[in-house]
Swiss-Prot record:
It comes from the Archaea. Gene3D superfamilies: 1.10.472.170, Cyclin-like. The keyword NADP does not apply. A zinc finger (TFIIB-type) spans 12-43. GO terms for biological process: transcription preinitiation complex assembly. GO terms for molecular function: DNA-binding transcription factor activity; TBP-class protein binding; zinc ion binding. Pfam families: TFIIB (PF00382), Zn_Ribbon_TF (PF08271). Sequence repeats lie at residues 129-212, 223-304. One of its GO terms (cellular component) is transcription preinitiation complex. This is Transcription initiation factor IIB 1.
């Protein structure tokens, strides 16, 4: 109910809460609702709520309504099972007699046990609950959760779970899904909602991508600009300047072999100095999940190679 209310509120947003502009950009690729004037990321879990079906004639158009929830990989039984209602009412809405409620209670209990009747199903159920928790804390869109669930299921089939914690494998699958769907989340952000160290998540992710042959393109520094700038409360001018610096750096071959978050952080830091919206290296480093040393190194490379006139 809370989730439905949240989605409704997102759909009803007409003005930017920061500057009041009505120029809102709905970026479905990255799951973000961005202000076109000041660059604020108003919502970072924005997804298209419209139907995914297509109709080619009037008959198909009439038959598009669903009789239930669609199949999903984020539930261990793919959402295909049914539950006995806890409302203690029959199909006509009449209350169940008191003498029959104990029997109904036992039926519910056994149905719940049967749904996860063996160790493999219990493992999968626990893992997908953990995935839901992580994704909720990071405001991950539903399509990314679906991708992560599919990756985890493949890892189970390949017997990659043995010797590893469920939480670590789920975290690796979620990070891989974010990379595949171009929804930028850093390893540090994933690690912040788990009890698994960032290094272990990275190792699990690399093993998964190799053995499952995941088609993952290298992440780009520009994918992180909008979210980092929004967290730092920087204007659209600073965001555009950071993107301009990044494009110049890419053309000059300065981003090759460098961590995208570090390059993005340095570009934002330089842009904030150039536009007069000064942010400290520490503030930028905390948002980007990198060290101040990384920002200083990237800052020096970019300003020298691109001959940028920046006053610190």
């Amino acid at each position: 109910m809370v989730e439905n209310t949240k989605k409704k509120k997102v759909e009803e947003i007409e003005r930017c809460p920061e500057c009041g502009s009505t120029n809102l950009i709905r970026d479905y690729e990255h799951g973000e609702l961005v202000c076109g004037e000041c660059g604020a990321v108003i919502e970072d879990a924005y997804i298209d709520q419209g139907p995914e079906w297509r109709a080619f004639d009037s008959e198909q158009n009439e038959s598009r309504a669903r009789a239930g929830s669609p199949m999903t990989y984020t539930i261990h039984d793919k959402g295909l099972s049914t539950d006995i209602s806890w409302k203690n009412k029959d199909s006509y809405g009449r209350s169940i007699p008191t003498r029959n409620r104990a029997q109904l209670y036992r039926l519910r209990k056994w149905q719940k046990r049967i749904k996860v009747s063996n160790a493999a199903e219990r493992n999968l159920s626990q893992a997908l609950q953990e995935l839901e928790r992580m994704a909720s804390n990071l405001s991950i869109p539903d399509d990314v959760k679906e991708t992560a669930a599919v990756i985890y299921r493949k890892a189970v089939k390949q017997n990659m779970i043995r010797g590893r914690s469920i939480e670590g494998v789920v975290a690796g699958a979620l990070y891989a899904a974010c990379r595949i769907t171009n929804v930028p989340r850093t390893l540090g952000e994933i690690a912040s909602v788990t009890r698994v160290k960032k290094k272990e998540i990275g190792r699990t992710y690399r093993i998964m991508s190799r053995y499952l042959k995941l088609n993952i393109m290298p992440s780009k520094a520009e994918d992180y600009i909008s979210r980092f700038c929004s967290k730092l409360k920087l204007s659209m001018d600073t965001r555009n300047k950071a993107l301009e610096i990044l494009r110049s750096a890419e053309n000059a071959g300065l981003t090759s072999g460098k961590g995208p978050t570090g390059v993005a952080a340095a570009a934002i830091y330089i842009a904030s100095l150039m536009t007069g919206e000064r942010r400290t290296q520490r503030a930028v480093a905390e948002v980007a999940g990198v060290t101040e040393v990384t920002i200083r190194n990237r800052y020096k490379e970019l300003t020298e190679k691109l001959q940028l006139n920046v006053e610190q």
